[in-house]
A protein has these predicted regions:
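Carbohydrate-active catalytic/glycan-binding domains of CAZyme proteins
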Residues: 1-174
Length: 174
C-alpha cells in the first residue's frame, strides 16, 4: 500500500488516502486503486493514511501480512482536518480490516471511532496534540504481556515549558 496526499503544499488539498500499487521491479508501478477513501461525515473524513498491520516479523521469514480472525488489519492516521498531516486539526489512530484479497483494490471496512485519541482519559501530555503513524505487530509469545503491540508516535505540548515534543509510544491489546 501507499499513502497519497492530494495537495501540493502543506495547507492545500484535502488530506491522505491509502491506495495499492504493484511492481515487478520496484521501479515501475501500476496503481490498482484505493483501499481507504475519504468518508464524508465521519471522524476521518479528510485523513485516511494507512499502515498494514501484523507482518510476519520472523528474521528471515516471509514478512507477509498475517490474518487474525480471518481478516487482514491496518491502522491509519485519520481526522477531519485538511492539509498535510492536518496541521490545523488533530489526527487520531483508526483501525480498518478486510476479509478480501489484499492484492486487489477494494474499500476496507473501518471502525466508527478511533482506537487511539488525544481525548483518551489516559493520554499523556505528549499524546494530546496529535497522533501520527502506527505499526501493529503480533507477538505470539506475549513478551510484553499481550499478543498485539502497537508502536505509534504522537505530539503534544509539555505542561511546564509549553514546548512541542513528540514521542514514540507502545500500546498493548489482548
Amino acid at each position: 500500500t501507499y499513502v497519497v496526499y492530494n495537495g501540493k503544499g502543506g495547507t492545500d488539498g484535502r488530506g491522505y488516502e491509502t491506495w495499492i500499487a504493484e511492481s515487478d521491479n520496484l521501479l515501475e508501478w501500476r496503481t490498482l486503486g484505493r483501499v481507504l477513501s475519504y468518508r464524508d461525515g465521519k471522524w476521518d473524513c479528510n485523513q485516511r493514511g494507512g499502515f498494514p498491520a501484523l507482518p510476519d516479523m520472523e528474521w528471515g521469514g516471509s514478512y507477509e501480512l498475517q490474518t487474525y480472525k480471518g481478516r487482514h488489519w491496518m491502522t491509519y492516521i485519520g481526522g477531519e482536518g485538511t492539509g498535510y498531516e492536518a496541521v490545523k486539526a488533530p489526527l487520531y489512530v483508526g483501525l480498518a480490516w478486510t476479509k478480501g484479497d489484499i492484492s486487489t483494490a477494494h474499500e476496507w471496512e473501518s471502525m466508527d471511532k478511533p482506537i487511539l485519541s488525544i481525548h483518551d482519559k489516559d493520554a499523556q501530555w505528549w499524546e494530546k496534540l496529535t497522533q501520527y503513524k502506527s505499526t501493529v505487530y503480533w507477538d505470539k509469545d506475549k513478551t510484553l504481556g499481550a499478543p498485539f503491540v502497537m508502536y505509534y508516535n504522537a505530539g503534544g505540548r509539555h505542561p511546564e515549558t509549553d514546548l512541542k515534543g513528540e514521542r514514540v509510544g507502545i500500546a498493548l491489546s489482548k
